[in-house]
Amino acid sequence: LHLAELSLICLTLYAVTSLVVGTRLIARSWRSRGLPEFLIGCTYAVASGTGYPLSVVAPYLSGRSATLAAMIVAQVLIVLGCSAFAFFNAKVFRPNSSWSVPVAALGSLVFAGSGLGVIAAFLSAPEGALAAESARSATAVFLFALVACQTWTALEGLRHYRMMKRRLALGLADAVVTNRFLLWGISGAISVTWNGVVISALLAGANVSASPVPVLAVSLGGLASAVCLVLTFMPPVW
């Protein structure tokens, strides 16, 4: 099994898992009228489950027009999903803090601006050129903002896990809910790690689609994230 094939399998698994989990969460939000479920559902269904795989497939489409159209749609979906993620952090973990919503809004602006930069790079790249190389700077900025959001969610998940663990010892919390905060924190840390590796590769001038280290990091990170998603939102019945 070649590294490229392993990467494709892992990322496909992550995308499918994200789409299924995200769709279920959005459906649940329609029934419960819950904003958090809707926001995180959009994150997974729109960005991870649809936008990201579309951006991977786009360069292989037949014809420049089809490729550009797919890349534009993919970037819009990714920006929307990642912005929803930022506001999920604000609304769920810091609902009463005066700074959380402005920080989420700032993150969304960075996502939108860098997303536009990626689109502009693809539109201006000459035919036959590696447009991804032209979008290197904008992609790095986008990933920096994403890693910041993922660091935020990882720290909040682990902070709430510690709080719930103390309450669990007093019989005031549920063990399953407590464990899910731990899984959420671990999932965030995994995402920070694999995106951090990609950022380092981008800044070093490496081809992140072909270099073994970022490809392996993305593959294993995607696989681990898929497992955490299932255990957090669709745990098996033992």
Tell what function each PLM region has.
Residues 2-22, 33-121, 136-147, 210-224:
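Individual alpha-helical transmembrane segments in multi-pass integral membrane proteins
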Residues 121-125, 170-175, 234-238:
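General structural signal for secondary-structure boundaries
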Residues 123-133:
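Interfacial non-cytosolic loop connecting adjacent transmembrane helices
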Residues 153-157, 180-238:
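C-terminal transmembrane-bundle signature of multipass membrane proteins
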